[in-house]
Structures are given as C-alpha cells and as structure tokens.
C-alpha cells in the first residue's frame, strides 16, 4: 500500500505519509538487526582479562594530569567489559581533546599486561603515525614492542613487521586498514581499537573478530552523535560518553550551516586568520571526480579561495 501511495498518491500528504511509512520500516528492521547482533554478542565467549592494578597505577602516576571524572567513569565501564567473560563491543564518544586516547591507552595496557596483543586502527596514515608517536611516548616506561603498519610501509619492512606480529613479538600494532588484510595473521589479539571509522559497519566488525578468538572491540568517535542516533547506527554496541573536558580545555562548539551561508563561513574564517588564528577546511575529495561531480575537491576550493 505504501509503495502504491509513493508512486500513485491521491495527494501530496498521501505521498509524504507513504514515504514516512517505508522509512519507518527500514529503520525498524535496521534496529531489530542491530539488537539481534547485540544479543548474539552476549552469548559469545570472550577474553576474560584480569585487572593489573600495579601497572594501571604506574601508568597514571607518570601522567602530568589527573583523569577527569568522565574519563574515570568510562574507564570503569570498559574495564568491567574487559574483565567479563563476554566479548566487549563498545562505542566511546567524546569531543576532540576530551581524553579518549588516554582511556584507549589504559585499555590497551590492560590487554598487553594479560599477554595479549593490542591493535589500534586509524582512518588515515597521518593519524596512524601521530598515534604511533603518541603511544610510544605514553608507554615509553613500559617494556612493550610497538609497531606501525600502513600502506606506505616498504615491502621488505612490511614482511618483517608481519612476521613479528605473527610470532607474537609485537605487543601493540598501530596502523590503517592494512592491519586487517587477509594475509596478516595475529598471534593473540586481545583488544582492537578503531578510531573515527564511520564506515566500519556491523559486518566489518564481525570480520575483525575472526582475526582472533573473539577479541574485545572499542570504537572511538569525536562526532557529536545524539544518543538516539548512536543507538540506531551502532545499535549492536554499548555506549560510553566522555562528557567533560580537562581543566583549561574549551568545549568544542559544533554548528551546521546551509549552502547559502558558505560565503559568511569563509568571511568568519578570514576574520579568525586576520586575528592570527588558524582555520581548516576539510574536503571529501583531493581532486575533482567525474563519479561524484557535486562534491567539491580540495584542489578546486584551494583555487577558488
């Protein structure tokens, strides 16, 4: 009836109601599928980590700041998952600068202290390299071997790194999608952390579990997703939110503007640049694509500005 109403509506309202009915059905089945997957996760036997208090305290004592109450709460939620017998599947949400990386470091330390491998995937090579350097510094006082694996790593070096990973001589592996290629076999993965990967759907997350014996999974995002939408998109995941910024950090203000406000946005950016500050414009494409003509590329925008 709704399909008929979409194509042969009696009036404009009839067409709108028919469309809403079909949209509701699509979201309903999507949510139902996600909830079924979450139910399956509850029956999956995961890795039961044992809390290593000494190492935890040692890591926290070397930091030149204290965790916020929100970080402590979120870490407690993650720790509870790690110590349980079921597999963790959790989404960690928090603004840029809220301290998600430190929480991820605590989680990865826990899995490494239990003699499992930690895996951290970033969406780009630049971010992977930044995280690699960051974790090297954060974990410099611990005797763990950390490797970086991205698509630009030379073939000979890649083979050596992959061999170290397969033999269990690598404790923490940081990289991009190269971490999940079929040819790469892990020795004993305990926790997989994925940073800002929105296109990693339910099926892709299942494929990660096949890399080991149901390793725990933590997905991090700085995108301010409303709880209701997060449950729709990531319905098979539990949700933790860092809703507090460290002292001295300003809260991130996020705004959405229509296309007709583009000129005003550029004027605002120019004002900030004139004040000696910086502005960043992120484009979906580097160069113009015939397949996606409506999207503005970085090269085009650079010439226009």
Task: List PLM regions with ranges.
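Residues within well-ordered alpha-helical secondary structure of globular protein domains
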Residues: 33, 77-80, 164, 271
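Generic recognition of stable, solvent-exposed alpha-helical segments in well-folded globular domains
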Residues: 22-26, 69-73, 77, 91, ...
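Inter-lobe coupling/hinge segments of SF2-like helicase ATPases
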Residues: 87-305
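Short secondary-structure junctions and interdomain/linker hinges
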Residues: 6-14, 34, 38-41, 66, ...
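Alpha-helical structural signal
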Residues: 24, 28, 75, 102-105, ...
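Generic amphipathic alpha-helical segments used as scaffolds and interaction surfaces in large
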Residues: 14-22, 62-65, 122, 126, ...
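Conserved pre-motif I regulatory segment
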Residues: 46-93
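Upstream accessory/linker segments immediately N-terminal to the RecA-like ATPase cores of bacterial MutS
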Residues: 1-62
